[in-house]
Design a protein with these regions (language model features):
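Short functional hotspots at interaction and active-site rims
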Residues: 1-159
Length: 159
């Protein structure tokens, strides 16, 4: 965080991928037995979840089918994150190439906010990474195997 900045103004934006084959990574079994769990091989279309973490929690969340690209990130900035920005906000992004496409900075700066990029290879500086990890654990526990079940589990994980 920049010295002298108000931490309440920071919005850490990041994306994460989801699919229909999420399963718990660890389990328990009686002594001498192995844990077994079936996981589907076909996971369907991946789902990308993008959101902004503030001191008040996760906000401005959007899900989309497939991977994040410049066009979908521009839609997120204009229609989802943009309306939540007020002059003086600081939008913190990692160094994903999609975040650095020409015109993205102008979408944020037009709202009176400013962009701040994390140093390369520094996910530890973005608290949203840990937030996504906790929420994805809840999704693994839910083991949604249909898109509808994933949406329902996602709503519970984001609540």
């Amino acid at each position: 965080m920049a010295r002298g900045e108000d931490s309440r103004r920071f919005k850490f934006v990041d994306e994460t991928g989801l699919h229909l084959a999420f399963a718990r990574r660890y389990g328990r079994a009686p002594g001498g037995q192995r844990v077994g769990q079936g996981v589907p091989l076909r996971v369907g279309t991946p789902v990308t979840l993008i959101g902004a973490l503030t001191v008040n929690g996760l906000e401005a969340v959007m899900s989309l089918d497939g991977a994040l690209n410049a066009a979908s990130f521009a839609v997120y900035l204009e229609q989802v994150l943009g309306p939540t920005l007020v002059p003086g906000d600081v939008v913190v992004l990692d160094n994903l190439p999609v975040h650095k496409v020409a015109g993205m900075a102008q979408l944020v700066e037009a709202r009176g906010a400013r962009l701040l990029f994390l140093p390369p290879y520094s996910p530890d500086f973005a608290p949203i990474e840990q937030d996504w990890s906790k929420r994805k654990t809840a999704l693994r526990t839910a083991q949604a195997r249909t898109r509808e079940a994933l949406e329902q589990a996602l709503n519970q994980a984001l609540a």
